[in-house]
């Protein structure tokens, strides 16, 4: 018996669309630009599908087309596709610029929010009490330790990436263990980055593990 239980949220609907129309909707990597008016095509194709409502479908489509990986895929020379993956009209310069601006604003909002949350967390951390005068005096009476040996020269600090400026095919280094490893960015999301090492291995890492 076919499952007719309604899909509960946009994430489930997008996963269903990927399964139903694999030549159009992509689960990982850069998404394909969708045909203008594709919502109407979806509504017609899924008219008899009890699992999807038009309201939820519209919301899921909006989420899919505003995702970073979808906006990353809107480039010059790319053609929009229909539900069966057939190419149609090429993207216009206006649509490409709009996608770049939307991507930039979305990244700025996300990383500004993260910086604010980090500052608030630091402010909530209890401060260590200042040492009492008696303790300070006692410490000053202790014999001074012998001078330490000159420190060994340390390499220049690694430069952390600006997550808001990361883009596909950009060269970075991934901090794995003691030394960074060269890699190439393959996908950027709100939470992490997918990179490919020189060995061909694909990894998904957090922004704080990337350096230049």
From Swiss-Prot:
SMART domains noted in UniProt: ProQ
GO CC list: cytosol
Gene3D superfamilies linked to this entry: ProQ/FinO domain
Keyword list, A-Z: Chaperone, Cytoplasm, RNA-binding
Compositional bias (Basic and acidic residues): 102-124, 132-144
BP GO terms, sorted: post-transcriptional regulation of gene expression
Subcellular location, record wording: Cytoplasm
Ribosomal protein as UniProt keyword: no
GO terms, molecular function: RNA strand annealing activity; RNA strand-exchange activity
Segments of this protein annotated with the region Disordered: 102-149
Role description: RNA chaperone with significant RNA binding, RNA strand exchange and RNA duplexing activities.
PANTHER family found in the cross-reference section: RNA CHAPERONE PROQ (PTHR38106:SF1)
Family membership noted in the UniProt record: Belongs to the ProQ family.
Protein name: RNA chaperone ProQ
Source organism (scientific name): Aeromonas hydrophila subsp. hydrophila (strain ATCC 7966 / DSM 30187 / BCRC 13018 / CCUG 14551 / JCM 1027 / KCTC 2358 / NCIMB 9240 / NCTC 8049)
Upper lineage: Bacteria, Pseudomonadati, Pseudomonadota, Gammaproteobacteria, Aeromonadales
């Amino acid at each position: 018996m076919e499952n007719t239980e309604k899909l509960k949220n946009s994430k489930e609907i997008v996963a269903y669309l990927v399964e139903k129309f694999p030549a159009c909707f992509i689960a990982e990597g850069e998404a394909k630009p969708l045909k203008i008016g594709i919502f109407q095509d979806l509504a017609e194709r899924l008219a008899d599908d009890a699992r999807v409502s038009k309201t939820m479908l519209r919301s899921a489509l909006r989420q899919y087309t505003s995702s970073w990986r979808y906006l990353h895929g809107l480039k010059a020379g790319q053609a929009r596709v229909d539900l069966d993956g057939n190419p149609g009209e090429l993207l216009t310069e206006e649509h490409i610029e709009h996608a770049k601006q939307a991507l930039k604003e979305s990244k700025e909002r996300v990383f500004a929010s993260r910086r604010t949350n980090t500052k608030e967390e630091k402010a909530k951390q209890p401060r260590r009490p200042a040492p009492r005068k008696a303790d300070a005096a006692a410490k000053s009476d202790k014999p001074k330790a012998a001078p330490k040996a000159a420190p060994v020269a340390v390499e220049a600090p690694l430069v952390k990436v600006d997550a808001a400026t990361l883009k596909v095919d950009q060269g970075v280094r991934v901090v794995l263990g003691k030394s960074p490893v060269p890699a190439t960015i393959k996908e950027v999301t709100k939470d992490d980055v997918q990179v490919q090492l020189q060995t061909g291995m694909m990894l998904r890492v957090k922004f704080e593990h990337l350096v230049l």
